[in-house]
A protein has these predicted regions:
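Small-molecule-sensing regulatory modules
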Residues: 1-71
């Protein structure tokens, strides 16, 4: 599971590189024009994905383990 912050303008670029299991969750942040993006990502892909997410505009990236995933 990966969570990150970004500007609204970066959302499409992030979605283009994010191999999410379904659509990501996008939440507004306190600062105008800023969002949080949360997505379930295969654990085998996450570490190779991080540089691309940074290049797409993601900041404050958190990677969390998933105990169980119910499809």
């Amino acid at each position: 599971y990966v969570m990150m912050n970004a500007s609204v303008d970066s959302l499409q670029a992030i979605r283009d590189v994010l191999p999410s299991m379904g659509t990501p969750t996008v939440l507004p942040l306190a600062d105008e024009g800023q969002i949080a993006v949360h997505a379930a990502v295969d654990a085998g892909d996450i570490w190779q994905l991080l540089p691309s997410l940074r290049a797409a505009g993601a900041t404050s990236i958190l990677v969390l383990p998933v105990e169980r995933l119910l499809p």
